[in-house]
Amino acid sequence: METVGTKRDLYWLMPLMGVDDGVIISKRGEVTIGWELSLPVVYDLTEEGYDEMVMAFANAAKLLPAWTMIHRQDVFTYDQWKGEYDGNYLHDCFNAHFEGRRYLRHRQFLYITMSSKGSALKANSQSAAFGIRFTAGFPKAQDLWMFANKADEFISVVTSCLHVQARRLTQEDIEGVGIEPGLVDSYLSVWQGGPLRSDLVLSPESMRVFDNTLTGFKVSEADDLPGEVPDVARIGDGSSYELFLSYSSALGVRLDCEHVVNQYILMPNQADVLRDLDRKKKKMTSMQNSPENRVNAKEINDFIDAVHRDGMTTCYHHLNVLAWGPEGTELEIKGKVSAALSSMGVTAVQALSDLPSLFFAGVPGGACEIGKDNLMIQELTSMVCMGLNETFEKDVEGGLVLVSDRMRNVPVRIDFQRRARALKWIDNYNVFLLGPSGSGKSFFTNYFLQQCYDAGEHIFVIDVGDSYEGLCALINESSGGRDGVYMTWDVEHPFSFNPFIGYTGWLDRQGNIRQDESGVTFLMSFLTTAWKPASGWNSDSLAILERIIADFVVWARRTVPPGELPVFDDFYNFLVRQIAPRIIPVRDEKGEIVRLPEHPYLVGELPVTPEDFDVGRFIRSLSSYSATGSYSFLLNDKHPKDLFSSRFTVFEVLKLSEGNALFYSLCVLCIMNAFDHKMRNASGFKRMVVDEAWKAIANETMAPYLKGLWKTSRKYFCSAMVVTQELDDIISSDVIKEAILMNSDIKVLLNQEKNANRFGQLESLMGLSEHQKNLILSMKQYQVYIGMNKHCGVYQIEASRQQALAFESEKEKKAPTLERARQLGSIRLAIDEQVNEEKSVG
């Protein structure tokens, strides 16, 4: 048999009288204050973090006056993902890929209600759901003032653990504004757009609200609970990793249906509770002819002893789950909720005749309608453990990158740059990315750089292997050729640079080299890599080299016409004509010294000898880079091209890497130095990505330049990013460890299954905490770990088919798309045509 209640009946039955300045007042005279809580993200906390949250909540509850009801309400509702389209091809394809995808949203509300023993512990039969008339009895002004102060103190302690933030609910939140429903109307329509637009239908096993059937399960008896309520739920594979969630998380973020979790904690007068328990024990003892009574009497006695012995705080507790869905989904929903409760070791008890009471008690401000028969006496801290203490990934306002929440597979906006630095999670923007072969390293880097470019960043890539060919071509096409410059080295079109850009500022007032000048550091790195003394570079030989550079700058200032730049050939000739004759003595045919230099080259008032600095061998080593040398093109560009007016530039150096190793290293260093100039002079955020090409410069002579670049990048609103795939490369390279890894606050790791047996080395190298290690080992394919010192998370990487084709890095797989692009004259048309063909095939 069904009972139908009209909207008029419903509002007559409502336990609420009204809302005044954000305070809910019930018809029984109870007063409720509420907050919306912001919780930690799933897998964000360690076991200790959950303990801190539980203790903060328990301590806060102990501050409240006797007979205060705490109502913690978690609301999980479905929504559909909606993209923000801006006309950008790949961005819009990404949005279209996810458009309309259903996902769960979560909000948690916390209410405290000032009540009395008689009101809070009334019989279920007196619930508003059964048409009981209310007798008003409003609290005094002094009591309200004291309660408001206690509420402030309560929420201050709740948030003291720093894992939770709270926002006080306002009049508008509760009542709504205009056509926007407030929390009360939203609850009564089970979040289907309220206010309630249909009758409320009651049946023996369910309720129908609006077009949804609502089913309830309750935990209101001690026998329903496991022997001991755990602090947390442990999530893991049983061997390699272990992560933590709330004990009741199976009812929260892991329960895939629309539902509300209501937790009620009534803080009683402790003496009253013990007296009531003692009376109940004596009653049971007097009827010991029943074995059940004897067991109950012993359990009550043990509980009283534990309270006295351990100083425990008692409370009345109730928890229920109200879940709903369209007609015909009742059995599926019941199965999900029942399975979730069973996984917690909790007996699943369906709410039948008392379902209306539970529903009305969930109305904001109606917590005391729960009724005494639905409450059980328990220890406070254990019951607090049954609360939900995590939520889904949340969008970061103004976040740069869209990734996917790995639990819901919908995009969330995150930021590990400006916002992260503002929160003091990082001190620089530098990124170190490690992705073993097959982990999707190139795909993720393309995915990331596309979004950085769309956000207005200047992107500069040094690559080995054409990993960014498709993305660069697409950017070039969409920007009309302004951006997306793809430079591949070959003999006919070699790279050409000028090492003396900004040289006039290289000296201080005393005429000494300024060590903090990037141009100086670059030139020193170039020269010390191009040639090494037999005994290696030492402080004396380096001091001589610095003096030579300083003297060249003085000479160039005098001789190079204004507006022009010296080139490397000028430096080479300066060495030959003005430095070498002042160091190398004149010798006869037998090699005997005939005459010492007439004007010896002095450094620190001491003459430099060939033994101090073998300038002859030095000159011979540099001759390859002079105007007549085999690499004359590299450093002799008097009018260097503006390679960086493009906001997306790729230097592909695979052919270089297959040739002379020394020249390859020096060429990569020159490319990085060119970016250094852009970093210091271009406006906006700049990003340099060195993908595998870093191996060419991972040596001791270039380390000072790299360390300087990585350390100063922050000052120029820049990110230096290294991408690599081999763990051995990091372990074996002190340059990577000291110059790059230690100066990169952002660590990005892709699936590390291939490094599972050597993970201890990676853990030690990167200084990972136990929690970070567990997060990384929990990753599956197409997931990414992003760590910002102590703050970290794992995200799903999912993209549209169009993005996948643009980001493809394997030559055989991307060849058909690139060939089609050549035929059509458009890579975008080629991608669209290929996607449409794939769809037609099915």
What are these regions (language model features)?
Residues 1-389:
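Extended, folded cores of ATP/NTP-driven motor/assembly subunits in large transport
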Residues 47-63, 346-347, 357-412, 418, ...:
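P-loop NTPase motor domains
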Residues 65-66, 106, 455-457, 482-484, ...:
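Short glycine-/polar-rich loops that comprise or flank the Walker A/P-loop
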Residues 85-89, 124-129, 365-368, 474-479, ...:
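Short secondary-structure boundary/capping segments
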Residues 417-439, 443-450, 460-462, 466-468, ...:
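Conserved P-loop NTPase motor cores
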Residues 433-457, 819-842:
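A short, charged
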Residues 768-821:
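Conserved P-loop NTPase
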